[in-house]
Regions:
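C-terminal motif of bacterial Sec signal peptides marking the signal peptidase cleavage site
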Residues: 3-4
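Short, non-transmembrane alpha-helical segments in secretory-pathway proteins
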Residues: 8-61, 111-118
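Exposed beta-strand-loop-beta-strand "reactive/processing" segments of non-cytosolic proteins
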Residues: 52-99
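C-terminal partner/receptor-binding element of secreted or periplasmic proteins
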Residues: 94-118
Length: 118
């Protein structure tokens, strides 16, 4: 692989990416709370019939990532230690829902390395 061709590193250079944490949410002072985003996400899933019998009260939901002021509901590969960029994005200030189909997996190590730099 050529240097500089790592899709994870290239994506991180052009976007503000954090692993989801309440600390980041509080620091950013978003207008849409995680609870509100979760409610929007569940409604989105129900409206598209992706989940038929979801009992929200008994289901723990949280975004996987925060990217460019969006709560991102995506996938984590625990074995390969990667997190997907694709999935459902909810704007943390407006509540607007979009889907991202970019087939990019970010290395968890790269995310943490970027955020640990001063």
């Amino acid at each position: 692989m050529l240097l500089g061709c790592n899709p994870s590193e290239n994506y991180l250079k052009n976007h503000e990416v954090f692993p989801y944490s309440m600390e980041i949410v509080k620091k950013k002072k978003y207008k849409i709370s995680v609870k509100e985003a979760n409610d929007l996400y569940v409604k989105y899933l129900y409206d598209r019939k992706k989940i038929k019998d979801l009992n929200y009260d008994k289901t723990f939901l949280s975004p996987t990532l925060i990217i460019d002021d969006h709560y991102v509901y995506s996938f984590r590969n625990l074995v390969m230690k990667k997190v997907a960029v694709f999935g459902v994005w909810i704007n943390a200030n407006t509540g607007k829902i979009t889907t991202n189909d970019e087939s990019i997996w970010l290395e968890e190590k790269d995310i943490f390395d970027k955020n640990s730099k001063p």
